[in-house]
Regions:
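Divalent metal-coordination and catalytic microenvironments
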Residues: 65, 74, 107, 119, ...
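Short hydrophobic/aromatic-enriched beta-strand-loop microsegments
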Residues: 124-129, 225-227, 311, 348
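Short Pro/Gly-enriched beta-strand edge/turn motifs at strand-loop
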Residues: 42-50, 170-178, 197-199
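Metallo-beta-lactamase
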Residues: 71, 77-79, 174-176, 180-183, ...
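C-terminal regulatory/interaction regions
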Residues: 2-11, 16, 22-24, 320-385
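Active-site HxH/HxHxD metal-binding segment of metal-dependent hydrolases
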Residues: 58-59, 81-83, 90-195
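Short, structured coil segments at secondary-structure junctions
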Residues: 42, 122-123, 289
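Conserved beta-strand hairpin/beta-sheet module of binuclear metal-dependent hydrolase folds
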Residues: 36-95, 216-232
């Protein structure tokens, strides 16, 4: 059984030393580029605050904009450690939590908004976020429960064993404490503006990684605060998620199985085509004139076009590989994930399922595969079979 990333073959000591030197040289180039990019951001009054998270992705980047009002973009997760390090980072800039006047939330993932409620309560800051995500943030506990139900039914429908689903449900329930409901007091609209004294940020909805991904574009300085829309060192996983409440009411693009309905959160179909939507969002960002992209994780990006083109190639190659697996024999999405990555950690099962279904959706869109359901489980087969 082939694997997406097989173990590296053994190399002679001299070759290993050369490869190690190349890796160290690459890391040094990245460090210097990061320092230069962060200095450019600092000149624009934007400062990265790297906040710890309990998740595999590592630290999350919040951004302090020293303007009027004093603005913090994203908060980090709801944990004592995250709050402590955020306070220390603010102190290095001569500020306290109580000084924050505007708190901006980029999207609905808990590593980005978990502390928002505490920060807003302590500072009295306005809380700004895309209008579509405001109901989710205000009712986070109930929304998280519906998210889990949606994920559970989706996993069972695509072949993940019930015992694995049970474990994942428990893990997800444990994660909820890292988030907390928060009331949005300043709803933002796609294409609207967030005006500060010395700059105006254009608000752009860029769904895909999540339904609510929002980026903030300083057109004058050609700087984008992109959160998880674009990350240098990893491909942002377009996670399968329930559509936002307003999308369920007003309609949302790119669904498999028809338009979303009020029952979507408790029904296995239709499901959002997250990767199709994400690629469309990346196309829009690719066309923009940007000098600097400040990401939600990792280092800044200074050539967004090259990075997006690399992501497009990655998705094309993966879709082609999945297409070959399906052409060999009909498979469930879970079977495809096992073929590509083997028996990954149980906690990663939903991530790999999202990855597979995203690329299958590209094949479904192109008409090269079809899907069939038997006994409540979906299998994909080549369209010619």
């Amino acid at each position: 059984m082939s694997r997406e990333e097989p173990p590296a073959a053994e190399h002679p000591p001299a070759q290993e030393k050369t490869q190690q030197q190349e890796r160290e040289s690459q890391r040094e180039r990245e460090r210097l580029a990061t320092d230069e990019a962060l200095a450019l951001a600092a000149q624009a009054g934007i400062h990265r605050l790297a906040i710890p998270t309990p998740f595999m992705v590592g630290r999350v980047n919040a951004y302090l904009i020293e303007d009027s009002p004093l603005t913090l973009v994203d908060s980090g997760p709801n944990s004592a450690k995250a709050l402590d390090e955020l306070e220390q980072a603010l102190a290095t800039r001569g500020h306290t939590v109580e000084d924050i006047e505007l708190l901006v939330i980029s999207h609905q993932h808990i590593d980005h908004f978990g502390l928002a409620s505490i920060l807003a309560r302590r500072s009295g800051a306005e809380v700004a976020a895309l209008d579509r995500v405001a109901p989710f943030l205000a009712s986070y506990g109930q929304e998280a429960e519906l998210d889990d139900l949606f994920a559970e039914r989706l996993m069972l429908r695509h072949g993940i064993p019930p015992e694995v689903v049970t474990v994942l449900r428990a893990v997800s329930a444990g994660f909820r404490a890292w988030g907390a409901a928060v009331q949005v007091t300043r709803p933002l609209t796609d294409g609207g503006e967030l005006a500060l004294r010395d700059r105006t940020l254009r608000v752009l909805h860029r769904p895909g990684h999540s339904p609510s991904d929002t980026v903030f574009w300083d057109e004058q300085r050609s700087i984008m605060l992109a959160a998880d829309h674009l990350i240098a060192h990893i491909s942002s996983n377009p996670l399968l998620a329930r559509p936002l409440t307003t999308d369920r009411v007003g309609g949302a693009p790119d669904f498999v199985g028809g338009a979303p309905t009020a029952e979507h959160e408790t029904s296995p179909t239709p499901r959002p085509r997250a990767l199709v939507t994400y690629i469309d969002s990346l196309e829009k960002t690719r066309a923009m004139d940007l000098k600097l992209v400040l990401s939600g994780h990792g280092r800044p990006i200074t050539d967004h076009v090259a990075l997006i083109d690399e992501r497009f190639r990655l998705h094309r190659r993966r879709a082609e590989k999945i297409g070959r697996l399906i052409a060999a024999q009909p498979r469930t999405a879970h079977e495809i994930a096992q073929e590509l990555w083997g028996n990954v950690a149980v906690t990663q099962a939903y991530l790999t399922l999202s990855e597979v279904l995203g690329h299958v959706d590209l094949l479904l869109r192109d008409g090269t595969v079809t899907e069939e359901e038997q006994d409540g489980v979906v299998r994909f087969r080549a369209a010619s079979l």
